[in-house]
């Protein structure tokens, strides 16, 4: 029987860890009062070393499918732009140079393109696609709401992402705030066939693909649970779910106490 292995983060003082597709290296983010820095280590935690230099804000790293590049966001030049670097720390390369906010890059399977979040158009967080060779970028999504955490499917046919797309949540009992619900969507790399695959009414995010490109793993919590997490005096609770992209069927993968975010599929 095929078993799904996951690496996930628990909300605490630690940061998101990302295992290389070869399962031999871990990439993680270290937070300090004045900077955010990327580190890399062996899969067993040994050999920890810095990947980027201190003094700048580097965050939201993502491995390329072959494991030869890491794309990340950096504010070292003043605005949030995309950079890439080899796992040994060589070949630092600035990919975008725009006054808008460019963030959350994800490589295509052939590593020739990167889908990312940007505020270049309409002052909203939409998805764009960057040609790594030419450095030309094109718009992928538009409309109301924000689109976040894009992830390219291993077969290259879909891009999964989370979006609030105008969905609002009524105020919780005794509170005046409103919070947008967030769903998981799919879109083709050419911008066609946009569809929602998560059950509406929850707060779902950080989609990741299974290796067969047939399912998406994401964290989900009920709308009411989000209030506990936001105010800090109560413990929130999320579960990781596996969503079949053909049927929309959702099955829990990891549940129980605690706020679980940013899953990474290992196999």
Where are these regions (language model features)?
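A structural motif specific to WD40 beta-propellers
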Residues: 48-49, 92-93, 138, 194-195, ...
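An edge-strand/N-cap motif at the start of beta-rich repeat modules
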Residues: 21-49
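Short loop/turn segments that connect beta-strands within beta-propeller blades
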Residues: 42-46, 86-90, 131-135, 188-192, ...
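Conserved beta-strand position repeated across blades of beta-propeller domains
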Residues: 62, 106, 151, 208, ...
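A flexible loop/linker signature enriched in serine peptidases of the S9 family
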Residues: 30-39, 52-57, 73-83, 96-101, ...
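Bacterial N-terminal signal peptides
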Residues: 8-17
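Hydrophobic beta-strand positions that form the internal "hydrophobic ladder"
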Residues: 26, 70, 114-115, 159, ...
């Amino acid at each position: 029987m095929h078993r799904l292995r996951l690496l996930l983060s628990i909300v605490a003082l630690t940061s998101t860890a990302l295992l290389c597709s070869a399962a031999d290296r871990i990439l993680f983010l270290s937070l300090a009062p004045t900077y955010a820095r990327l580190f890399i280590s062996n899969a067993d935690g040994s050999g920890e070393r810095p990947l980027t230099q201190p003094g700048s804000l580097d965050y939201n790293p993502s491995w390329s499918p072959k494991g030869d590049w890491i794309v990340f966001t950096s504010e070292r030049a003043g605005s949030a732009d995309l950079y890439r670097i080899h796992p040994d720390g060589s070949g630092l390369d600035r990919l975008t140079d725009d006054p808008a906010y460019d963030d959350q890059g994800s490589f295509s399977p052939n590593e020739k393109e990167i889908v990312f979040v940007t505020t270049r158009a309409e002052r909203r967080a939409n998805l764009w696609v960057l040609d790594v060779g030419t450095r030309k970028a094109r718009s992928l999504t538009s409309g109301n709401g924000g689109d976040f955490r894009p992830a390219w499917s291993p077969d290259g046919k879909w891009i999964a992402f989370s979006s609030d797309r105008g969905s609002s949540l009524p105020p919780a009992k005794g509170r005046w705030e409103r919070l947008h619900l967030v769903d998981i969507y799919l879109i083709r790399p050419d911008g066609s066939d946009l569809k929602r695959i998560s059950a509406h009414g929850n707060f779902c995010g950080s989609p990741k693909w299974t290796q067969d490109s047939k399912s998406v793993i994401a964290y989900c919590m009920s709308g009411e649970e989000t209030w506990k997490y936001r105010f800090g005096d109560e413990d929130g609770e999320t579960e990781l779910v596996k969503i079949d992209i053909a049927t929309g069927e959702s099955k829990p993968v990891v549940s129980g106490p605690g706020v679980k975010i940013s899953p990474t599929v290992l196999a």
